[in-house]
């Protein structure tokens, strides 16, 4: 079992509510309990090692994929259905309870984020944390303080092992 709760020290933590560090088994439980989950992926997912795991996560948990940046091509090349959306626009939409979602069935209650630059996703999740009831779970290598839950700062090898463990637990 990979310990993904390590290395979560913050340097700017005064007055900030930070995310809870979690292990892959807890993430799997949260995904299974979500009523309307959405898997949000960034451009970093195009690395073959990560893309294969992202596809397995989405398929095994039956989660729709919101591809941001240039990540859509990787999923389309693998024959996986994914919808493109700008990350900042998605963050804005998630704060609107009346948003119909990417599939027209309503807003999402949980988002799972993977492979974003830390400084970029933290800003988007700041909006969802403060202006919506959406739970955000980061399964990337970096600890994301504005997520509801996040893996800690882990090595690439530990990250791959954690994603494999998550897939096994779904």
Swiss-Prot record:
Q: Which GO terms describe its biological process?
A: methanogenesis, from acetate
Q: Tell me yes or no: is Ribonucleoprotein among this UniProt entry's keywords.
A: no
Where does the UniProt annotation place the signal sequence? none
Q: Report if keyword Cell inner membrane is assigned.
A: no
Task: Give, as in the UniProt entry, the pathway in which the protein acts.
Answer: One-carbon metabolism; methanogenesis from acetate
Q: Which UniProt keywords apply?
A: Methanogenesis
Question: How does pH influence this protein's activity?
Answer: Optimum pH is 8-9.
Instruction: Cite the Pfam families for this sequence.
Output: CO_dh
* Record SUPFAM superfamilies: DHS-like NAD/FAD-binding domain
Subunit structure, briefly? Heterotetramer of two alpha and two epsilon subunits. The ACDS complex is made up of alpha, epsilon, beta, gamma and delta subunits with a probable stoichiometry of (alpha(2)epsilon(2))(4)-beta(8)-(gamma(1)delta(1))(8).
Family (UniProt): Belongs to the CdhB family.
HAMAP family per UniProt: CdhB (MF_01134)
Give the protein's function: Part of a complex that catalyzes the reversible cleavage of acetyl-CoA, allowing growth on acetate as sole source of carbon and energy. The alpha-epsilon subcomponent functions as a carbon monoxide dehydrogenase. The precise role of the epsilon subunit is unclear; it may have a stabilizing role within the alpha(2)epsilon(2) component and/or be involved in electron transfer to FAD during a potential FAD-mediated CO oxidation.
State what protein this is by name: Acetyl-CoA decarbonylase/synthase complex subunit epsilon 1
Q: Which organism is it from?
A: Methanosarcina mazei (strain ATCC BAA-159 / DSM 3647 / Goe1 / Go1 / JCM 11833 / OCM 88) (Methanosarcina frisia)
Taxonomic placement = Archaea, Methanobacteriati, Methanobacteriota, Stenosarchaea group, Methanomicrobia
């Amino acid at each position: 079992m990979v310990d993904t709760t390590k290395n979560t020290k913050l340097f700017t933590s005064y007055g900030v509510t930070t995310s809870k560090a979690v292990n892959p088994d807890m993430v799997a439980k949260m995904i299974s309990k979500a009523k309307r989950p959405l898997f949000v992926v960034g451009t970093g997912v195009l690395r073959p090692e990560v893309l294969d795991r992202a596809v397995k996560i989405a398929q095994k948990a039956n989660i729709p994929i919101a591809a941001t940046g240039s990540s859509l091509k990787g999923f389309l090349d693998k024959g996986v259905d994914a919808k493109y959306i700008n990350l900042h626009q998605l963050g804005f939409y998630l704060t609107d309870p009346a948003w119909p979602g990417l599939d027209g069935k309503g807003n999402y209650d949980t988002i799972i984020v993977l492979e974003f630059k830390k400084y970029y996703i933290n800003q988007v999740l700041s909006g969802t944390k403060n202006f919506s009831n959406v739970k955000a779970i980061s399964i990337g290598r970096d600890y994301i303080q504005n997520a509801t839950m996040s893996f800690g700062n882990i090595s690439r090898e530990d990250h791959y092992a954690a994603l494999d463990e998550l897939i096994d637990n779904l």
